[in-house]
Structures are given as C-alpha cells and as structure tokens.
Design a protein with these regions (language model features):
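Catalytic cores of nucleotide-sugar-dependent glycosyltransferases that transfer UDP/GDP/TDP-activated
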Residues: 1-250
Length: 250
C-alpha cells in the first residue's frame, strides 16, 4: 500500500508542538508494516534548509495554481534518512525559505498553507507517486481533501484521504474573499468551506475527507459537544459516520 503523509511540521526537521512528535513516529511505524511504501511531505522551512545534517537533491519543479497566481515549487528529496520513509520537502523561498522566525504566526499563514496543500498534490503527480491513502493533519493541510475531491479527482481516482484533527481550536479561518482570491475552487464548493460568512478550511476537510480521525476515542466523543468542538460540533455530528479516534502511539 502506498501512503502519503502530509504535515506542516515533523520532528526532527521542524517542530512547534505535539504534531511534530506524531509525524516523527507515524510514518516510520507505517513503513515497518510489510507491503507499505510511505512518503512524507513537509514544507522546506529555513531552519531545515540551513541545517547541514540534511542532504537533499532537487527532483522536480513546477508551478502551483493559487487563485490567479502561479507560484514556484521545487521538490527536495532527503537522501540520508536511515529508515524506509522517503521524505520530500516542498520549497518556495517566499512562503517558507526566507523566514527565520516561528513556523506559524505570520499574517499570511492561510495563503502559505493553501499553497502547501495544493503543492503536495502537485508534487505527487510530478513524482508519479499516486498513493492509495493520503493522511493529512490539522488546519494547515485541511485543503488537501477539498482539492482532492474538487480539482484532482481525475489524477487520483482511487486515492482515499484520511484527515486527522490534533487540535480543533485552530481551524484555519479566513475572510470570505479568500475563497475567490486564493483557492481556485469550483463555485459549488463555496458552501463546503463557508461558516458564518467566512472560510473555515477545517470544516471543508471534515466535509470532504473519506475518514476523519482524532488523537483518541475520548477526544472523538468530546467533539460531539459544543464546549470541546469550538463551533464544529454540528458539522462533526453530521459526519459522525466517518469520525473515529485513534490514540497517539497505537
């Protein structure tokens, strides 16, 4: 089985919180199952680019359609990882390489990770790496299942997408104009992403992913209640048939 894991961080390369630890362990664990072929896509942050411990080579380059823009992307293949996981860093100097601060917190984070979400799918096509399953994480990768269903279905006809919520408090909100200006999605998907007259990319992922997982069975049950779901309890209830909890580390 071919599995692609997409995340905004992953230890030891770049880590901000618990997601980084999960992405350090999950692909490696999946790769140890006989028959699995696992690839990991991460942004090529400046802190990765300047770390001489990581040996990389450019294996593809293309343009990513982001609204009316076409933004450059280079795929950098990590060549000195010790296990069977193949790591690819997606390089764009403006969005990732030229920034020396924290991974998150820039005013254009919505644009940065909309770019990354679409670039992941474009990279899979460029590398002729069409997976059976795409596993993507939190709001930063929430547009992957949306793009997969709305734009890339012909290129990924048999691929299924699993979306994992690690922290529902951060949902990827944007102004309504973000839909037209940045996303380049068909008009009929406006409602999929709309919430309170704004764009909510996590809502879009819940609606379009084939499977939605959380970090534990307890957390999955808690998300049925407004106190824990931060406004998404109704959306999750409507999609409860595809929601499940998988405890971290299992």
């Amino acid at each position: 089985m071919k599995i692609a894991v997409c995340a905004s961080e992953g230890s030891p390369y770049a880590k901000s919180g618990g997601l980084g630890d999960v992405i350090e362990g999950l692909p490696a664990a999946l790769s140890r199952i006989e028959g699995n072929e696992v690839v990991l896509f991460l942004p090529y942050y400046n802190k990765i680019k300047t770390n001489t411990a990581y040996e990389v080579e450019k294996v593809a380059e293309f343009r990513v359609q982001l609204g009316w823009r076409q933004q450059y992307c280079a795929v950098m293949k990590l060549t000195n990882r010790k296990d069977k996981v193949q790591v690819y860093f997606l390089d764009n100097e403006y969005y990732f390489g030229g920034r020396t601060g924290a991974i998150y917190g820039d005013m254009d984070d919505g644009e940065r990770f909309a770019y990354f979400s679409r670039a992941c799918l474009d990279a899979m096509i460029a590398l002729d790496c069409i997976p059976d399953i795409i596993q993507c994480n939190d709001w930063q990768c929430a547009l992957i299942p949306v793009y997969l269903k709305a734009v890339y279905h012909a290129q990924f006809p048999k691929t299924r997408c699993m979306y994992t919520i690690h922290n529902i408090e951060y949902q990827g909100w944007a102004n309504a104009s973000f839909f037209d200006d940045m996303l380049g999605l068909p008009w009929e998907y406006r409602g999929t992403l709309d919430m309170n007259n704004s764009v909510n990319v996590m809502k879009g992922a819940i609606e379009t992913a084939d499977l939605v997982t959380t970090v534990s069975e307890t957390y999955a049950r808690e998300l049925m209640y407004p106190y824990y779901a931060h406004g998404l309890d109704g959306i999750l209830a409507n999609n409860s048939w595809k929601l499940t909890g998988i405890t971290n580390g299992i």
